[in-house]
Amino acid sequence: MHQRSVHYWGDIDTHGFAMLDQLRAYLPQAQSLMMDEGTLMHHSDHWGHEAQAQQRDLPRLTAHEHAVYDTLRDNRLRAGLRLEQERIGFGWVKQSLAALQK
């Protein structure tokens, strides 16, 4: 598994990023998928609420992932913001998966 590409697609919330950070403790090559600012902003009509946000530092996130995590953790857009992965549009998912093949 350590020689394989690994993609992680979780909810865009503080817990989703915490799980990504934990995964990278075992599989440091894991790449996030559809957990970026563009995905979050494109699906603003489907935002939900995260009742209890993670507050700890996540040292295994990339700079781009950390920017989104900090936005969520610090309530920069709104308090408790989250986007559940199942709320992301199918067309967006299909396009993102197709981009992996290139």
Language model segments and positions:
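Acidic two-metal-ion nuclease catalytic site recognized across multiple nuclease folds
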Residues: 102
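Catalytic core segments in nucleotide and nucleic-acid processing enzymes
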Residues: 1-97
